[in-house]
Amino acid sequence: MQRIAIIVLFGLLSSGANALGLLDAWELALRNDAQFRAAGFEHAAGQEEETIGRANLLPNLQYGYNANRSHSKVTQTDSFTGNTLKRDYDSYTSTLSLRQPLLDYAAWARYQQGVARTLMADQRFRDRSQDLMVRLYQAWSNALLAQEKLQLLDAQQRAYQEQLALNKRLLLAGEGTLTDVRETEARFTLIEAQRIEQQDNLDAAITDLENMTGTALDITTLYPMMLTQLPSAESGKQTLAQWRDLAVQHNAKLATQREGLAVSRYEIERSRAGHLPTLSLVASSRNSRSESEYNYNQKYDTQSVGLQLNVPLYAGGSVSASMRQAAAEYQQSQAELDDQTKKTLAELKKYYNLYNNGSAKIKAWQMTASSAQEAVNATRLSVAGGERINLDILLAEQDWYNARRELAEAKYSWLQAWLLLRYTAGTLNEKDILELAAWFQPATTSLANNKTIRQ
């Protein structure tokens, strides 16, 4: 597709003091959407997993100090005399200790889990960012589509109102029937009920968009879709097999689950470490005075360094049980990844077909709407000539407005399929939002009418 210059795009989106373009809504959603803000905090927390895991491999340095005031009575007994001494004295102990793991398989496994969890947090946040783009477009398009449907109902209601006025005039002139009046009144009343329902749908859609953007919105300030020229489907650029390869490699949900699988794999290794020895370098510097009755009024200054070896012998079978449990959880994670992969590829195929067939669908509904409009005009002439009846006009108008409604839905669905195809493939980014925003412009702008959208 022709790339739309960003400078031009920003110029288009900035026109109108109170108007709101899709790019403006995106910037607001980045700051105010509660789900995305929560994802940001979740991502920040996940970034610490690697550091926490690495800490188990690094030196552990501790300092301790203990001071006491002691009062004691010492009685010495021998065969001749007994002496009793009373002592009031201060004592302290100061210890600086260092431990450096040299061989600790469990600590290494925990570190690898931390790395995997950090990568998993990155992929999950990437998915949340892409999901925000999808949710924003859905909320945006739902609001505009609801408004468009409401406008179609208003136009249909006006048409029925004019037809009702004509039926009444013909009835008074003796050329019409009461049946014609009642039929048109019934259609008019039905449209009124549908209009009330559609107004509720519009209010709900606007509320969803307001919740995402964090600001009060008026539907009339949103840039409408300017997809008046038939888009060209560029299905030859990338085949379904190429899209499948992209999804397997880049889909954020699959990437998240792959990192989760790595966490499960290292959990097996961490459990296995229960069978293995650990070796640590230990060093300490200790100062004490009058630490106990046995070294009263004596001061010690001791430095030591050495190796500490721990060899597990038997733990009641818990290590083997933990390994079996971790292995089962790993298989569970693998099965869940396989299931998610199949679901992702199925969704990818659906959106691929929706996008590539969307152009033909839009063209078909354009032709249907045009034919339906001609049918309305022809039916009116036939009724005037006595060849058709009033009900035929009502049915023809109903078909026309239904076709226009289906055409509007097809346009929004086509853009949504374009967006979801990229989301499922894992390639969706802010450049796509810029490109998508170019299709929503002030009504006076016609640039988008001459553009096509890349596959």
Features from the language model and the residues they span:
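Bacterial N-terminal signal peptides
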Residues: 5-14
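Bacterial Sec-pathway N-terminal export signals of envelope proteins
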Residues: 18-66, 72, 100, 217, ...
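Small/polar (Gly/Ser/Thr/Ala-rich) solvent-exposed segments
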Residues: 37, 60-80, 88, 101-127, ...
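Amphipathic alpha-helical coiled-coil segments
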Residues: 38-53, 128, 132-152, 162, ...
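Short sequence motifs at beta-strands and strand-loop junctions characteristic
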Residues: 86-90, 237, 299-301, 402
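Hydrophobic, lipid-facing positions within transmembrane beta-strands of outer-membrane proteins
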Residues: 92-96, 243, 303-309
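Periplasmic alpha-helical coiled-coil/stalk elements that build and connect Gram-negative outer-membrane
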Residues: 131-246, 351-354, 358, 399-401, ...
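Acidic, low-complexity, intrinsically disordered peripheral segments
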Residues: 406-455
